[in-house]
């Protein structure tokens, strides 16, 4: 059976188990064959395994004659922007929102995550015999990449004055420790920071975009807060009343602001099968169509490029503003949200309350050999509850060995009961 290394967001696994230096070396050699004698940028988050994986990846690339530009700790969207500026390939060593023992490899080209076809080409080369090269590439430090990224973001928001504004940032002990605080301070904000360690054993641990309640509980009232994930491509907001503002609500607020500004293209917003029905209802009332895709920001981007939309994203906080960035960028999303709040002259809490949020529950069921999505009883119940008006999504995770069951409907108690029942059946 053909080996499949790439999932919905690059290669992902537990370091030393399903993700090894040997695998990273092979990825480097395979990518090196494709690149030829060009250059590849490498950035990483703060995980302790990042240095080891970078060394292996760089060894593979340079053995094929490719020069490596080492960016150090830098968010995924920063590396994406740098590949766009330099018109080159890039690799990010990160497992995004996953725990510290995980790591991953994401490949970028000219600002975008590579398509499935190129991932398959890398995999094919990894399983074959590598070409022999007689030219060895060089490894060079490219720490100026951070300043290039910060400069580009500040240029995008040169009309945004945050003087007198108080902002709280949860950096998840991850890659935004190198960028977010500096940018907000350059724009004039008074900044309070949580979880800014670069100790790779702390990344995403009880903090960041997957644990936004940490910031909601720790920050003072009257501030606006932003919780980033480990590699900086997600953000969840916290309003001045310390309520969590999820990705769906952020998308709704941005859509409202961009529409009033005349910036929302095609009157379309792209979401996923996980996007809350409350957002869909909110957008519909404003003449905006929600188009759904499979889960994964790369599928959101594909649909955006196809439909001409410039706003899309996921409830998890992966949000793409295509006239700002070619990928999800938590920092750019946070600044755009601040800009919209200022422009509409409303509190973030008031804007968030305008967007209904239907009760939605997700249960994770560990995948085993017995786990089957073709379970007859499971399919029967999904059909029955769907007919009763509940929206049900059952899908394997693309980044973890679990199956996610999501149930959405107007009755929270019933939603919980249905999610629990379906989980028990799937567990066998």
UniProtKB/Swiss-Prot annotation:
Its cofactor is Mg(2+). It comes from the Bacteria. The active site is at residue 96. GO terms for cellular component: cytosol. Keywords: Isomerase, Magnesium, Metal-binding, Phosphoprotein. InterPro entries: A-D-PHexomutase_a/b/a-I, A-D-PHexomutase_a/b/a-I/II/III, A-D-PHexomutase_a/b/a-II, A-D-PHexomutase_a/b/a-III, A-D-PHexomutase_C, A-D-PHexomutase_C_sf, A-D-PHexomutase_CS, Alpha-D-phosphohexomutase_SF. Activated by phosphorylation. Disulfide bonds: none annotated. Binds 1 Mg(2+) ion per subunit. Catalyzes the conversion of glucosamine-6-phosphate to glucosamine-1-phosphate. PANTHER family: PHOSPHOGLUCOMUTASE (ALPHA-D-GLUCOSE-1,6-BISPHOSPHATE-DEPENDENT), PHOSPHOHEXOSE MUTASE. This is Phosphoglucosamine mutase.
């Amino acid at each position: 059976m053909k080996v499949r290394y790439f999932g919905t967001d690059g290669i992902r696994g537990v370091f030393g188990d399903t993700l090894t230096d040997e695998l990273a070396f092979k990825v480097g050699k395979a990518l090196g064959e494709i690149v030829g004698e060009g250059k590849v940028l490498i950035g990483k988050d703060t995980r302790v395994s990042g240095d080891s994986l970078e060394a292996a990846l760089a060894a593979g690339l340079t053995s094929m004659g490719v020069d490596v530009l080492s960016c150090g700790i830098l968010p995924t969207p920063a590396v994406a922007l740098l590949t766009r500026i330099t018109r080159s390939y890039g690799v990010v060593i990160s497992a995004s929102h996953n725990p510290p023992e995980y790591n991953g490899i994401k490949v970028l080209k000219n600002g975008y995550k590579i398509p499935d076809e190129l991932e398959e080409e890398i995999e094919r080369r990894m399983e074959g015999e590598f070409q022999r090269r007689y030219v060895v590439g060089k490894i060079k430090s490219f720490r100026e990449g951070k300043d290039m990224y910060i400069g580009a973001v500040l240029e995008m928001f040169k009309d945004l004055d945050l003087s007198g504004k108080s902002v709280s940032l949860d950096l998840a002990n991850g890659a935004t420790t190198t960028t977010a605080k500096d940018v907000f301070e350059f724009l004039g904000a008074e900044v309070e920071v949580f979880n800014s360690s670069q100790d790779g054993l702390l990344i995403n641990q009880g903090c960041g975009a997957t644990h936004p309640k940490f910031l909601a509980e720790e920050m003072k009232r009257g501030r606006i807060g932003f919780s980033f994930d480990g590699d900086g491509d997600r953000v969840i907001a916290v309003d001045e009343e310390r309520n969590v503002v999820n990705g769906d609500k952020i998308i709704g607020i941005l859509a409202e602001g961009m529409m009033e500004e005349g910036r929302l293209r095609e009157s379309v917003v792209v979401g996923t099968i996980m996007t809350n029905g409350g957002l869909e209802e909110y957008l519909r009332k404003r003449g905006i169509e929600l188009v759904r895709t499979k889960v994964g920001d790369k599928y959101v981007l594909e649909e955006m490029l196809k439909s001409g939309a410039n706003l899309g994203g996921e409830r998890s906080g992966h949000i793409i503003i295509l006239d700002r960035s070619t990928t999800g960028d938590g920092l750019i999303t946070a600044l755009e949200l601040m800009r919209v709040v200022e422009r509409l002259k409303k509190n973030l809490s008031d804007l968030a309350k305008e967007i209904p949020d239907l009760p939605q529950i997700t249960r994770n069921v560990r995948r085993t050999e017995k786990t089957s999505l073709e379970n007859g009883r499971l399919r029967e119940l999904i059909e029955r509850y769907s007919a009763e008006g509940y929206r049900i999504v059952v899908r394997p995770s693309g980044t973890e060995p679990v199956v996610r069951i999501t149930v959405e409907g107007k009755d929270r108690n019933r939603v919980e009961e249905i999610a629990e029942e379906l989980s028990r059946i799937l567990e066998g």
